[in-house]
Amino acid sequence: MSEDLKDSGLTDQSNGSAAQYYFEFRGVNKAFDEHVVLQNVSFKVKRGDTCVIMGRSGVGKSVSLKHIMGFLTADSGRILIDGQDVTNFTERQFEVIRRKVTMVFQSGALFDSLSVAENIAFPLEDQPGLTAEDVDAYVAKLAHTLEVEEVLDKLPSELSTGMKRAVAIARALAQNPEAILYDEPTTMVDPIMAGHMGDLILRLKDAFHKTSIVVTHDTHLAKRLADNVVFLQDGRAQVFGSWAEFESSTDPFLRDFLLQDELIPALDVTL
């Protein structure tokens, strides 16, 4: 484990509760008016594993994450987090869940009026027993780990897309979560930054066993990260126990998805 990760203040989550699976979807259905997005979707994510959810745009990848965070409610089926059924949780109950599970949004979702340092420190505002000096020291450690220390005094509007993502990950880590959800972490960044994001997520996983779900259409990233793969197509989920199993599937929709990803180069080169 690298020294910066050792000193980051993050803790190993491999020895949490007795629940083997941190996330479970059991026959989840979701429709918006007549448009069915999730149809009897079931999958499990083991504690400490990284699950990659793949599929074309609009198939329900991000919708799945929003169900976990309590931003959307399933029409039917069950969702379990750390062995606890959260399907019908209230907003107040989900506030507790969000202290354990954080989400890195595609947009970064940073506060425009706050500096990078203030954005990273935001989840720590209500932490009992932390002095201002404690918060500053912790933010500095996270900034070093995420390699964003050079921009701590800048506003989000002054950052590149890739740097905003790195800051968003730092803010997500500030509350030392048990699990992290990543929504398209490499979209609209160039290959170098995409590789950096993959390195970072992999380091966090290997060092601290954070349970993760990564929504992406980036097969290069997915291949590096995936312990298991969920492929969404027409509202239904196919679950694969490894990337090799996913890649060797003969399903025509899946083969076409992989082929298109190989043939179409990344068009977004904005850092």
Regions picked out by a protein language model, each given a short descriptive name:
Residues 176:
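Conserved catalytic motifs of ABC-family nucleotide-binding domains
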Residues 180-183:
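Catalytic Walker B motif of ABC-type/P-loop ATPase nucleotide-binding domains
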Residues 69:
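Helix-to-loop junction immediately C-terminal to a conserved catalytic motif
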Residues 84-85, 132-150:
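Conserved ABC ATPase "signature" region
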